[in-house]
Design a protein with these regions (language model features):
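N-terminal, Lys/Arg-enriched amphipathic/low-complexity engagement segments
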Residues: 1-28, 32, 36-39, 43
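Conserved catalytic cores of phosphodiester-cleaving nucleases, focusing on short active-site segments
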Residues: 42, 50-56
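Mg2+/Mn2+-dependent nuclease catalytic core
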Residues: 59-83
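Acidic, metal/cofactor-coordinating or nucleic-acid-engaging core segments within structured domains
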Residues: 85-153
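Phospho-regulatory, Ser/Thr- and acidic-rich intrinsically disordered linkers and terminal tails
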Residues: 144-145, 152-166, 171, 179
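Long terminal regulatory regions of eukaryotic proteins
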Residues: 173-175, 184-186
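Conserved small/polar residues in nucleotide/adenosyl-binding loops
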Residues: 188-194
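Gly/Pro- and small hydrophobic-enriched strand-loop and loop-to-helix capping segments
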Residues: 198
Length: 198
């Protein structure tokens, strides 16, 4: 079963979240469990929903968007934001906020900042195209950033990023929405749960 953004938002208002474990080291587990609870199959599709993306997060913490590695061809080929994987993924996102005790806080869509995210994406793309080695970098609007996201393999090695035969990072990187942005979404744009779901 694949849901639309609106169907997912309605279903979330009626979901019992007490059964979802608090995320520990792998914060993606909550999102996977949330998808299963909603009947959304875990898959490698670009977006979770028919018409958008589902992102769960802890209020005030950054939100992982997508791995950098698979976006490099678009970055180096100057693919416009609205046609890029990141642009498609983030253009219609349903944010699902939890507090640190795993209590459901509500949902939000926040499309009015897409232009600011696009500007940050372009800042980051310029940085990547000109950097010899990647470091944490945040766009000028302070919404989107890249930083390391990697874990060691069974041999104790990270997964370096190479482009055109050159190593540009000795670890994997990902795009994130900053904690500051996630906090702003939490405080100003959440549709609060109904009493039936509390």
């Amino acid at each position: 079963m694949t849901l639309t953004l609106r169907e997912t938002q309605n279903k979330l208002q009626k979901t019992n979240f007490e059964e979802l474990p608090k995320p520990r080291k792998n914060k993606g587990v909550r999102g996977q469990l949330l998808e299963l609870a909603l009947g959304i199959p875990n898959s490698s599709k670009l977006t979770d929903l028919v018409d958008g993306e589902l992102k769960s997060y802890t209020k005030g913490e950054s939100v992982a968007v997508t791995q950098l590695r698979h976006t490099l061809p678009e970055i180096f080929n100057n693919t416009p934001f609205n046609k890029s994987k990141l642009g498609i993924k983030i253009s219609r996102t349903l944010y699902v906020a939890f507090d640190r005790n795993n209590n459901f806080l509500g949902t939000a869509t926040h499309t009015e900042t897409n232009k600011l995210i696009e500007q940050d994406y372009n800042d980051i793309c310029d940085y990547i195209r000109n950097a010899k080695t990647l470091h944490t970098f945040t766009g000028n609007n302070g919404i989107l950033q890249i930083r390391t996201k990697d874990s060691k393999d069974r041999n104790g090695n990270y997964h370096p990023i190479n482009w055109e035969g050159k190593e540009i990072s000795n670890k994997g990187f990902a795009f994130y929405l900053t904690g500051r942005y996630a906090k702003a979404v939490s405080y100003t744009h959440l549709t609060l749960p109904t009493k039936a779901s509390v």
